[in-house]
């Protein structure tokens, strides 16, 4: 892959939602992905159009925008999913896989899954000093 280090830097800077969705897949599948599997899934999702990436500008803040979160999760699990945006007050029910959207200032946002201890960043100002401003709730279609 050309500019591999820049790609990884961009994933680290902008890829929190992608990585949270893959964490949902890990929880559902009952196994952790290794780095090569994560990279392969991310590149496949970009090629399929589920995730945006600008190969002409690795610092584009729209990189790793998830157009189709349900399809990304399907790619990683082999199952079909729905996803809904919910308010922070939403109480999850059995079968829900929840991703939290955090913000400390109302502008910068970060996705994490603190309910199961997952945060793609070692330290996140949004999580440390912010609050949950939204949820993404995934459910498997049976």
Task: Name these PLM-found stretches.
Residues 10-11, 15, 19, 32-33:
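Soluble non-cytosolic domains of exported or imported proteins
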Residues 1-12, 126-130, 139-142:
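Flexible propeptides and autoinhibitory/regulatory segments associated with cysteine proteases
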Residues 20-24:
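Stable alpha-helical structural segments in soluble proteins, enriched in small hydrophobic residues
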Residues 25-141:
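Conserved active-site-adjacent core of cysteine acyl-enzyme catalytic domains
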